[in-house]
Amino acid sequence: MENEEIPEFLSPKEEIVYWRELSKRLKQSYQEARDELIEFQEGSRELEAELETQLVQAEQRNRDLLSDNQRLKCEVESLKEKLEHQYAQSYKQVSLLEDELARARSIKDQLHKYVRELEQANDDLERAKRATIVSLEDFEQRLNQAIERNAFLESELDEKESLLVSVQRLKDEARDLRQELAVRERQTDGTRKSAPSSPTLDCDKTDSAVQASLSLPATPVGKICDNSFTSPKGIPNGFGTTPLTPSARISALNIVGDLLRKVGALESKLAACRNFAKDQASRKSYTPVNLNSNSSSSVLNSSGVKYSHAGHTSFFDKGAVNGYEPPGVLGSRPPSPPGMLPLSV
């Protein structure tokens, strides 16, 4: 409106009308502006009150939020401390578990190594066990052979003792038969003196008996033993009342000759065994002795070998007449001289 140009008036009335209308327009605009101002003031007051209430609420909310923030900060600090403490504990626990894991792995490696060593030792022990079993079987076999040999030697020793007994008995019987022969010869000499016509017949009979005895084969040793045990019943001792028949006398002479030959063979056999035992004893006496314990053990072993058959010493006491002392049973069997009968016969 300020920029509006004032028109030119033709008359004062037109000017007055113009200014009146202008004033009316300005007054109306003023009224409108005033109303708007009043309305704006009222609206601004309401808005201010509302903003104040909102500000109060915002301040209250801000205070609440600040308190909540402070509380949350405290909680965060506490949680952070707890987290740090928990992290430290977990780190310590993890480090401890790692150490334990390292120790467990080292122990596991050691155990694996120990298991391998045990397996190797077990294999060695199994091989040693198999070798021991084989050696034990070999030892048992040798022990059984030694036991069998010992039993065989004991049986030979028993047979030898029985042979010594039978030889002594046969010696007694031979002595009795010699005495009986001497008595018979004296009787025959008396009968020859009383009857001079019969000597030729008796000489022929005795010559035929001697030739028959020389022509007969040698009696086996088993039969000799049987005859030696049965002779007291079948052969009279010269003091009985029953006289000997010529056939019985021939058989008795044959048995006596065989027995004398066997006794001589046995005596030579025993002498050879005695010489062999003396040689063995002399060889043992010349062996060097290194330790006292070895000497004592050898003495004990020799004494054990010598007295291992103490139950048979009575028969050897009887056989000691020939000067024979038997060697150890467990020792090696002496070789038989050529042309001699074995002791096991």
Swiss-Prot record:
Q: What is this protein called?
A: Nuclear distribution protein nudE-like 1-A
On modification after translation, the UniProt record reads: Phosphorylated in mitosis.
A cellular component term, taken from the record's GO annotations? spindle
- What's the source species for this entry? Xenopus laevis
Domain of life (superkingdom): Eukaryota
Question: What keywords appear on the UniProt entry?
Answer: Coiled coil, Cytoplasm, Cytoskeleton, Microtubule, Phosphoprotein, Transport
Q: What Gene Ontology terms for biological process does this UniProt record contain?
A: cell migration; centrosome localization; chromosome segregation; establishment of chromosome localization; establishment of mitotic spindle orientation; lysosome localization; microtubule nucleation; mitotic centrosome separation
Q: Which PANTHER family would you find in this protein's record?
A: NUCLEAR DISTRIBUTION PROTEIN NUDE HOMOLOG 1, NUCLEAR DISTRIBUTION PROTEIN NUDE-LIKE 1
Q: Which family does it belong to?
A: Belongs to the nudE family.
**Bias (Basic and acidic residues) ranges:** 182-192
Write out the annotated subcellular location.
Cytoplasm, Cytoskeleton; Cytoplasm, Cytoskeleton, Microtubule organizing center, Centrosome; Cytoplasm, Cytoskeleton, Spindle
> Which portions of the chain have biased composition (kind: Pro residues)?
334-345
Query: Which GO terms of the molecular function aspect are on file?
Result: microtubule binding
